[in-house]
């Protein structure tokens, strides 16, 4: 009986040691600099963590270094921050360049769609073959996802379509003027376009790629150096816990009031209808999957990009992910 009791106590101790532990009163907070986008969904998650003190709950104090997405992704490589928001495809490029990155927690799905005018005759993405389409630059994750979707439909994004590269605002203007038939667009801009009554979604990237690969494409994760992950496991656990709490709040709708307070600043949503639609879309785009099955789905998406020549071959893609 005593032996069984000792085994039970040991089991409880081991279980507790694997769980994130909230900080005790008076315990010093460990500073963590994280590069992230100042606006949009990545910026929103960062603001939510700060506002709700989800970081200090686990003994860390996150300072968000606001940058554009490309700059943020390279901040760890340049030694400017300990961690950074980045796309898995960016992590692949960083590993190839000699910066050994590990992804530790999910943030958001792609949220991208092919958007057309409401009265456009197109019923499928394939119907756009040979047409002018507005797309992001070839080096972006948004372009990467569009190329993978085309490949899976036995099309070539570069050969079968007339790509017109542009930034967000210019893409919307191109569609408004009728200079392209469709644009690759992301949230919250897609929501605002659809809410105007003039446009519709032709193809949702997240739905399409989940149907093909078993999970939506991850647009943003938190990346750290392999050395940091190996030497500071408690810190990694704390960062993951803060982000997991934020994602849980979003998925369960507990951030309703906070979203409304940030809708204009971070998403440029103004009317009650836009805010309501944006809230639902933000909830849907919060990424809450992790683990082996999820990693395999993302690896297949990345491998498709490698086959297209959009990404370098770095060997075993499983090494990117921290379970």
Regions found by a protein language model. Give the residues of each.
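Pocket-lining segment of extracytoplasmic ligand-binding domains
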Residues: 89-90, 164, 169-263
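Hinge/cleft segment of the Venus flytrap/periplasmic-binding protein
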Residues: 310-323
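Short, solvent-exposed loop/beta-turn-alpha elements that line the ligand-binding surface or hinge
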Residues: 53, 57, 207-215, 284-293
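Secondary-structure end/capping motifs
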Residues: 229-310
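Bacterial N-terminal signal peptides
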Residues: 7-17
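Short, glycine-/small- and polar/acidic-enriched structural segments
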Residues: 26-165, 174, 181-187, 202
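Sec/Tat signal peptide C-region and signal peptidase I cleavage site
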Residues: 19-25
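Positively charged n-region of N-terminal signal peptides that target proteins for export
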Residues: 1-7
């Amino acid at each position: 009986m005593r032996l069984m009791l000792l085994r039970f106590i040991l089991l409880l101790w081991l279980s507790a040691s694997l769980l994130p532990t909230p900080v005790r009163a008076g315990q010093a907070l460990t500073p963590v600099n994280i590069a992230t986008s100042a606006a949009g969904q990545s910026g929103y998650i960062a603001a939510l963590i700060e506002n709700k003190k989800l970081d200090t709950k686990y003994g860390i104090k996150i300072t968000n270094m606001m940058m554009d997405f490309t700059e943020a992704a390279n901040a760890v490589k340049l030694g400017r921050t300990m961690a950074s928001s980045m796309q898995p495809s960016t992590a692949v490029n960083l590993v190839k360049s000699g910066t050994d990155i590990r992804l530790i927690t999910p943030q958001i799905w792609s949220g991208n769609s092919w958007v057309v005018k409401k009265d456009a005759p197109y019923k499928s993405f394939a119907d756009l073959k040979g047409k002018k389409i507005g797309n992001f630059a070839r080096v972006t994750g948004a372009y990467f996802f569009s190329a993978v979707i085309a490949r899976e439909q036995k099309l070539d994004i570069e050969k079968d379509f007339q790509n017109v590269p542009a930034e967000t605002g210019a893409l919307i203007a191109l569609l408004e003027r009728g200079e392209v038939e469709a644009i690759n667009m992301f949230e919250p801009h897609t929501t605002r376009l659809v809410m105007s009554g003039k446009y519709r979604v032709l193809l949702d990237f997240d739905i399409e790629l989940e149907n093909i690969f078993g999970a939506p494409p991850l647009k943003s994760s938190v990346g750290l150096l392999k050395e940091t992950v190996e030497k500071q496991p408690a810190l990694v656990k704390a960062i993951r816990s803060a982000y997991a709490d934020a994602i849980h709040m979003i998925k369960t709708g507990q951030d309703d009031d906070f979203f409304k307070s940030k809708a204009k600043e971070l998403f440029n949503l103004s009317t009650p209808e836009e805010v309501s639609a944006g809230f639902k879309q933000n909830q849907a785009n919060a990424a809450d999957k992790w683990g082996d099955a999820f990693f395999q789905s993302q690896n297949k998406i990345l491998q498709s990009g490698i086959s297209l020549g959009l990404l370098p071959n770095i060997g075993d893609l499983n090494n990117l992910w921290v379970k």
